[in-house]
Amino acid sequence: MESFAYVLILTFAIATLFFAIAFRDPPKIGK
């Protein structure tokens, strides 16, 4: 259970950073 919570928080942190960069600069990946 502890490892699952850790992975969930880590994924949320990475997603937050990804969206922050994606919305700050024009998308360079994809279309």
Swiss-Prot record:
InterPro entries: PSII_PsbT, PSII_PsbT_sf. It is a single-pass membrane protein. One of its GO terms (cellular component) is plasma membrane-derived thylakoid membrane. It is found in: Cellular thylakoid membrane. SUPFAM superfamilies: Photosystem II reaction center protein T, PsbT. GO terms for biological process: photosynthesis. The chain crosses the membrane at residues 3-23. Keywords: Membrane, Photosynthesis, Photosystem II, Thylakoid, Transmembrane, Transmembrane helix. PSII is composed of 1 copy each of membrane proteins PsbA, PsbB, PsbC, PsbD, PsbE, PsbF, PsbH, PsbI, PsbJ, PsbK, PsbL, PsbM, PsbT, PsbX, PsbY, PsbZ, Psb30/Ycf12, peripheral proteins PsbO, CyanoQ (PsbQ), PsbU, PsbV and a large number of cofactors. It forms dimeric complexes. Found at the monomer-monomer interface of the photosystem II (PS II) dimer, plays a role in assembly and dimerization of PSII. PSII is a light-driven water plastoquinone oxidoreductase, using light energy to abstract electrons from H(2)O, generating a proton gradient subsequently used for ATP formation. Belongs to the PsbT family. This is Photosystem II reaction center protein T. It comes from Synechococcus sp. (strain CC9902). The gene is psbT.
